Amino acid sequence: MVNPYTEVADGNKRIRTFDSSVDATELVWHRDRKTRQVKVLESAGWRFQYDNKIPTELNTGDVLRIEKETYHRVIAGSGRLVIEITEYED
């Protein structure tokens, strides 16, 4: 499966960019092996959802901590989503 984003890595940080034209079926529920901090660098109507929770809007400057093995997903908005991901060793 091809990732629904482009990514640039720099040490333990990665910049991911999602385009608004991404197919919604590619934005799947998933969980990560490591705890992550996600900083929103750019968002236009994108939302974030934890399993069994109501989606919340992602705004530029928001910082999320996603614990390892926690199901979550993003929901496409009207423009790009650009995030900075920092992974932590648990």
Model-derived regions: residue spans:
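Double-stranded beta-helix
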Residues: N3-A9, R14-F18, V82-D90
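Short acidic-glycine-tyrosine-enriched beta hairpin
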Residues: D51-E69
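Ligand-binding loop in jelly-roll beta-barrel domains
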Residues: E67-D90
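Conserved short histidine dyad/triad with adjacent acidic residue
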Residues: K13-R33, L41, R65-K68
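Well-ordered beta-strand positions
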Residues: K39-L41, E57, R65, I75
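Short alpha-helix capping/helix-loop boundary micro-motifs
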Residues: R31-R33, Y50-K53
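Basic nucleic-acid-binding interfaces
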Residues: A44-W46
